[in-house]
Amino acid sequence: MSLTVEQKAEILKEFGQGENDTGSPEVQVALLTKNLAELQDHFKEHKKDHHSRRGLLRMVSRRRKLLDYLKRKDEKRYVAIVERLGIRR
């Protein structure tokens, strides 16, 4: 259910600003988005898994806060990441 090292490295390469960039908002949002997509597949099969659903809601909230921060600091980067990931806003 969690991302493999290879998947994380691929996301870092695609969205990171440098080789070891793991802290930029774009990378964090991309990682959370990938995790959320995998969790949504999990919930299609396990509808009554309320314990994990709480974790999903925390991740959605974290992504929302990161996107709000990015929008406040640099709206161009915000628009670019929302379009690249296909996030509804």
Curated annotation (Swiss-Prot):
Claim: Transcription regulation is one of the keywords in the record: no
GO molecular function, one term: structural constituent of ribosome
Presence of keyword RNA-binding: yes
Keywords: Ribonucleoprotein, Ribosomal protein, RNA-binding, rRNA-binding
GO biological process: translation
One Gene Ontology cellular component: cytosolic small ribosomal subunit
SUPFAM superfamilies with a match to the protein in the record: S15/NS1 RNA-binding domain
Role this protein plays: One of the primary rRNA binding proteins, it binds directly to 16S rRNA where it helps nucleate assembly of the platform of the 30S subunit by binding and bridging several RNA helices of the 16S rRNA. Forms an intersubunit bridge (bridge B4) with the 23S rRNA of the 50S subunit in the ribosome.
NCBIfam families the UniProt entry points to: S15_bact
Quaternary structure and interacting proteins, as annotated: Part of the 30S ribosomal subunit. Forms a bridge to the 50S subunit in the 70S ribosome, contacting the 23S rRNA.
PANTHER family recorded: RIBOSOMAL PROTEIN S15, BACTERIAL AND ORGANELLAR, SMALL RIBOSOMAL SUBUNIT PROTEIN US15M
Family in the record: Belongs to the universal ribosomal protein uS15 family.
Protein's name according to its UniProt entry: Small ribosomal subunit protein uS15
Organism: Idiomarina loihiensis (strain ATCC BAA-735 / DSM 15497 / L2-TR)
